[in-house]
């Protein structure tokens, strides 16, 4: 099952089920990743960084997938697989739920641990 969970400057993020590992994952699809040199460098830099992250407060990369089509010449799309998180800090901050001081302190603590 695949469900769109977000989108950003570089593409769309969907949730899916990894049958081989029996877990939920997030797949970030970056269309035309190599169309622009600056964007390509940014995406490759993100991939290089993600593969080194091994911390419970930072999402690391699980896998990269080639395009679904077997069309190698036009290879422009990149698929990055990461663990699926229940939510992200952006959604929490912009939700209508009031955050207590304890919530804010806990989020700051988690961010500082990740740094």
Task: Map each language-model feature to its residues.
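Conserved beta-strand core positions
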Residues: 25, 59, 78-80
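Protein kinase glycine-rich loop
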Residues: 2-9, 13
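Nucleotide phosphate-binding site architecture
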Residues: 6, 59, 90
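Conserved N-lobe motifs of Hanks-type protein kinase catalytic domains
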Residues: 7-8, 22, 53-56
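Conserved HxN/HPN-centered segment at the entrance to the catalytic loop
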Residues: 54-65
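Conserved alphaE helix
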Residues: 40-48, 52, 74-79, 83-115
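Glycine-rich ATP phosphate-binding loop
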Residues: 12-33
